[in-house]
Amino acid sequence: MKHYLLYHRHASSDCAASFAAWNAFSSELRGAAAMSTCACGAHEIWWWAEAADVRAALARLPNYVAERTLAIRVKPLTTP
């Protein structure tokens, strides 16, 4: 499995829709911890995902959210 950082961004006017998209959507990311700037006014969310490829990583998100998300492949690093 590969590691992905899922970077999602939406306009403040789309915040409610971005969260509502999770209703009735089944994913291991649902209920998982994520980092968000919505409460800080920037409307960005980051998730960690393990998946075989970019498509599989984005499939862990509802379509509305995935369409506004960049899946970035990452690898662990020990800071020197």
Residue ranges and their predicted role:
Residues 1-80:
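Conserved, structured core segments of small domains
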